[in-house]
């Protein structure tokens, strides 16, 4: 029976989460997941949220605001999945701000400069509402902020391109407040192969990537294996001397053939390593039906481009996508689907090794029916 269909296991899970307060266990489940699954009242949800420390390890706010500087996430702004009022309503204590570097920037140059801009942007968000928000660089900061009634914004880099082949940049970004680095993103880079890139340049990690891991270990920056090819993920687990994380991934067991997700053996290995797997909320990450829909859309767009000799920036592609989506409604996942991924990590690696990495503001309009925003 699926984890989400076993209330007694869910209750034990909640009780265990309430008792855990160690450094790695600040990576807890959101109240909305637990309380909705248990059909608790709104007041019960709020009470639970106040009793535990809730952390989401991956939210793509900075790049959204960078592209649309008119957005102010310290006030209500429903153009995206995240803003401060909804963060407070959901009881989220700490939201890792993703310093996302697109692969196109990596190829064109300027990755480090963009990372600096995005980090400064996060500091700018905090400066707008210092009585409500604070930058966090360690677990103690998050606990202190919680007691003071402040929401925490720790930071992680998504795509290691800003390292730019220079190990000195590891300490540089640590001083800037970065506490994890996702080694690659949608394409292989100078550090690692990507799960999305069919051209595997390195057979896993590059030689520089194998040097980078110990440097990150020494600086106290967590190594994030989300987005990596299988070979790269296994090599990280072999090389790293400290626990690794998957900041926003899900399980391949439920979506066979989707290499962006983790295998059961990887989950077990992360647990043995002492790390944490944070579950991504995107529907196409958590159900095979949604992934099939996405694959079919990609194939249809590719065929349409080739038939009409269009490039990737042609505006007619947007119209084609919208029309196709109207004719083929997207099969949104539900809360229970996300819970099943969480439950399987518990079964495979133990309760100490599961968390959430929602990917809010990063997976577009594919969020599950019951998890549409951070509230």
Please report, for each region that a protein language model flagged, where it lies by residue:
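Bacterial N-terminal signal peptides that target proteins for export
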Residues: 8-10, 16-27
């Amino acid at each position: 029976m699926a984890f989400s269909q076993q209330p007694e296991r869910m209750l034990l899970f909640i009780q265990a989460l309430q008792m855990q307060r160690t450094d790695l266990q600040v990576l807890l489940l959101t109240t909305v997941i637990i309380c909705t699954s248990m059909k608790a009242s709104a007041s019960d949800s709020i009470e639970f949220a106040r009793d535990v420390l809730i952390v989401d390890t991956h939210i793509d706010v900075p790049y959204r605001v960078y592209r649309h500087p008119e957005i102010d996430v310290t006030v209500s702004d429903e153009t995206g999945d995240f803003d401060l009022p909804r963060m407070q309503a959901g009881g989220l204590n700490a939201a890792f701000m993703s310093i996302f570097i697109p692969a196109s920037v990596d190829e064109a140059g300027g990755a480090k400069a963009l990372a600096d801009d995005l980090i400064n942007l996060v500091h700018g968000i905090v400066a707008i509402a210092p009585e409500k928000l604070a930058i966090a660089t360690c677990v103690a900061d998050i606990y202190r902020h919680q007691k003071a009634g402040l929401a925490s914004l720790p930071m992680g880099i998504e795509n290691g391109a800003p390292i730019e082949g220079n190990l000195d940049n590891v300490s540089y970004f640590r001083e800037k407040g970065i506490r994890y680095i996702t080694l690659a993103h949608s394409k292989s880079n100078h550090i690692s192969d990507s799960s999305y890139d069919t051209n595997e340049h390195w057979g896993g990690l590059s030689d520089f990537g194998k040097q980078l891991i110990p440097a990150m270990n020494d600086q106290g920056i967590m190594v994030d294996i989300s987005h990596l090819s299988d070979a790269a993920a296994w090599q990280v687990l072999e090389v790293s001397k400290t626990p690794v994380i998957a900041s926003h991934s899900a399980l391949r067991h439920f979506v066979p053939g989707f290499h962006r997700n983790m295998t059961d053996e990887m989950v077990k290995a992360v647990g043995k390593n002492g790390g944490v797997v944070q579950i991504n909320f995107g529907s196409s990450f958590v159900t095979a039906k949604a992934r099939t829909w996405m694959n079919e859309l990609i194939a249809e767009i590719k065929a349409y481009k080739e038939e009409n000799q269009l490039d990737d920036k042609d505006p007619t592609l947007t119209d084609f996508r919208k029309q196709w989506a109207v004719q083929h409604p997207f099969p949104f996942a539900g809360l229970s689907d996300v819970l099943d991924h969480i439950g399987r990590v518990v079964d495979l690696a133990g309760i100490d090794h599961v968390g959430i990495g929602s990917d809010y503001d990063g997976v577009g309009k594919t969020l599950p029916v019951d998890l549409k925003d951070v509230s």
